């Protein structure tokens, strides 16, 4: 798409927004319902696209993408009417007689830039929240998942006039052109490197941003944990989508006493969940492209592999891999892995683990497996991270009742459900002052009696 075409889309959306057409709640609900119906209609095409881009099975596509999108749509259709209402707040006595309230208002023209790892979910979920809040939206799906991007464009074109919601497909040139435009809000999901670029571009227009980034999400396993169940849930969360999940456990950090047994249980679970030859499992996906395939393979130290390690370059597949005797200085610990490679590191005390985790960049997620409630409380209170689980992995993002977002280097802002509505809304603080009474004490000339009254009101 050309620079001129992109500018025209943004200008038309701004003009459309200023007509007030997106403000009525009924219109927002109609848009969400239409989108839901269209997604249900195109589910087979969505599944096919996700299979071609990432090798996802239909089951995984529904569980991790389409189903979550439909759930968010249903939730926002139910709750948008209440979220969109003005919220009356207490008026101080000094402002008698008046009514004070907070009025949720859309920002205007929103840009949503989404990644390739969950290309449908991470494009449509923020769109849902932005529409519910009353905005117009420009979507920029990832060029790395072209089949899903084309299906998204088909759905959006059928559902919406481009002056309301539009899709811009393309690569780096389109990204740069979009970021040079003046949007009223930018929502970005992707790497920390690109997130910094987005924030720098947004600062030119003082545009607010939500950044959903990544990081090395630790999975702490305390010695009281149920190791069989721990292994089962770690294997699920780590190797889902071949490890290409922003909240996947990046590495295991376990008590030294239980490491060997934990690794044995993980090896068992890999065989149980993926079979003895995972690369022949039709439900096991693939790495997105050759660049990332090569990058992940280069992180694997064959001398430290205790499970997996094999790959199929032609199919861009890497078997579920576990590495033992890893140190924080190893290559695999210098960047977010974003693939099916699980390093195992050990600590001698929980305090040591907390200190180490806090010495690193704040992760998007943190997981703690333990039977000790005090240990769970200590870790979740003392460590900085976006969100996480106690005795499970990744499921904290699969609910509309809690916001999902990063912290520090892993991002800023959150979305899903009410948090998503808040993200895409500006709350105007308004005082409606009555005209039937006008107390004189704020006006000059000031008097002693007014000062006494003022001091009673304001203290």
Q: What does each of the following model-derived ranges do?
A:
Residues 17, 21, 36-39, 43, ...:
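Structural signal for hydrophobic packing residues in well-ordered secondary-structure cores
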Residues 160, 193-327, 390, 452, ...:
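ALDH superfamily catalytic-core signature
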Residues 15-21, 112, 219-221, 251-256, ...:
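Short, well-ordered beta-strand elements within core beta-sheets of diverse protein domains
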Residues 220, 271, 317-459:
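Conserved C-terminal structural/oligomerization subdomain of aldehyde/semialdehyde dehydrogenase
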């Amino acid at each position: 798409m050309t620079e001129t075409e992109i500018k025209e889309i943004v200008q038309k959306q701004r003009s459309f927004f200023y007509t007030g057409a997106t403000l009525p709640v009924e219109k927002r609900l109609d848009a969400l319902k239409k989108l839901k119906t269209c997604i249900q209609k195109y589910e087979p095409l969505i599944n096919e696209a996700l299979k071609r881009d990432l090798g996802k099975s239909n089951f995984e596509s529904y569980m991790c993408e389409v189903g979550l999108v439909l759930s968010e749509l249903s939730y926002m259709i139910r709750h948008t009417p209440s979220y969109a209402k003005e919220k009356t707040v207490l008026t101080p006595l000094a402002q008698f007689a008046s009514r004070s309230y907070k009025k949720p208002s859309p920002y205007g023209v929103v840009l949503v830039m989404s990644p390739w790892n969950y290309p449908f979910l991470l494009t449509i979920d923020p769109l849902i929240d932005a529409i519910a809040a009353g905005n117009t939206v420009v979507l920029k799906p990832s060029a790395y998942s072209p089949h899903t991007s084309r299906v998204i464009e088909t759905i959006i074109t059928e559902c919406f006039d481009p002056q309301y919601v539009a899709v811009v497909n393309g690569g780096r040139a389109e990204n740069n052109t979009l970021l040079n435009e003046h949007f009223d809000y930018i929502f970005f999901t992707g790497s920390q490197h690109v997130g910094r670029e987005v924030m720098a571009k947004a600062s030119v227009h003082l545009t607010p941003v939500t950044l959903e980034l990544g990081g090395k999400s630790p999975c702490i396993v305390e010695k009281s944990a149920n190791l069989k169940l721990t292994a089962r849930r770690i294997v699920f969360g780590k190797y889902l989508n071949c490890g290409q999940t922003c909240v996947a456990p990046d590495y295991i950090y376990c008590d030294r006493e239980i490491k060997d047994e934990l690794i044995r249980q993980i090896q068992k679970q890999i065989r149980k969940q993926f079979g003895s030859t995972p690369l022949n499992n039709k439900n096991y996906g693939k790495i997105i492209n050759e660049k990332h395939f090569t990058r992940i393979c280069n992180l694997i130290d064959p001398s430290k592999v205790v499970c997996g390690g094999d790959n199929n370059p032609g199919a861009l597949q890497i078997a579920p891999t576990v590495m033992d005797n890893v140190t924080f200085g190893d290559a695999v610990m210098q960047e977010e892995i974003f693939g099916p490679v699980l390093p195992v590191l050990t600590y001698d005390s929980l305090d040591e683990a907390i200190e180490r985790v806090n010495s690193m960049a704040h992760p998007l997620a943190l997981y703690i497996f333990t039977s000790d409630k005090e240990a769970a409380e200590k870790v979740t209170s003392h460590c900085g991270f976006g969100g996480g689980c106690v005795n499970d992995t990744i499921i904290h993002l699969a609910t509309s009742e809690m916001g999902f977002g990063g912290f520090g280097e892993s991002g800023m802002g959150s979305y899903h459900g009410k948090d998503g509505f808040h993200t895409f809304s500006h709350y105007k603080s308004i005082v409606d002052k009555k005209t039937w009474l006008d107390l004189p004490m704020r006006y000059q000339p000031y008097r002693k009696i007014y000062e006494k009254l003022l001091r009673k009101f304001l203290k």
